């Protein structure tokens, strides 16, 4: 007696397709300079949670007066005691602080909140990118730009835009030197207790 093969109404993805599918996790961003434009705090916080879950130390450098809301991050499961926050006065100081953190080799993820900074000089981008690659770390730049505004610089390997629609968050690749632009990821999030 022979066993019948099960037929699925859709093709089963191959192992190659499964491993090449983009994911929003630290392992996808290590060794890269990543920019998240326009409202990327949630996306950066997801990376902090992923890094901490995998035992990777993280640091957050902020050059703006408002940053993430610590109680929200703690409620999501982040260990705030293991997340050093460096407050600086300008984007240039923030980039130097990120450079020192990466050079130490102690951090798997460094988030640099640049705010409305128009860009970073090429030499600084090159140094940050090289340090991220050398120490197998991810450097995530948070900027406040529209999708049609230019990137922070040419060394940015991945540029993502965040779009919100109610409690749906869509991450869309505007630039990706590994996969090409255009791919997107969708995530459903819950709001604060008063909005649920």
Where are these regions (language model features)?
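A generic local secondary-structure boundary/capping motif
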Residues: 25, 128-130, 161-162
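A contiguous pocket-lining binding segment that forms or flanks enzyme active sites
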Residues: 106-149
């Amino acid at each position: 007696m022979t066993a019948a093969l099960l037929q699925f109404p859709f093709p089963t993805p191959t192992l190659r397709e499964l491993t090449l599918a983009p994911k929003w996790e630290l392992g996808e961003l290590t060794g890269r300079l990543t920019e998240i434009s326009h409202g990327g705090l949630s996306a950066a916080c997801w990376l902090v949670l992923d890094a901490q879950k995998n035992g990777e130390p993280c640091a957050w450098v902020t050059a703006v007066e408002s940053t993430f809301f610590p109680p929200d991050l703690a409620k999501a499961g982040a260990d705030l005691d293991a997340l050093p926050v460096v407050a600086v006065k300008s984007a240039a100081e923030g980039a130097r602080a990120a450079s020192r953190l990466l050079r130490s080799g102690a951090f798997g993820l460094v988030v640099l909140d640049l705010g409305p900074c128009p860009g970073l000089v090429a030499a600084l981008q090159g140094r940050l990118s090289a340090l991220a690659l050398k120490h197998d770390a991810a450097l995530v730049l948070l900027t406040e730009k529209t999708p049609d505004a230019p990137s922070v610089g040419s060394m940015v390997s991945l540029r993502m835009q965040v779009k919100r629609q109610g409690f749906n968050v869509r991450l869309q690749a505007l630039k990706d030197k590994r996969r090409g632009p255009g791919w997107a990821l969708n995530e459903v999030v819950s709001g604060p207790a008063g909005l649920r």
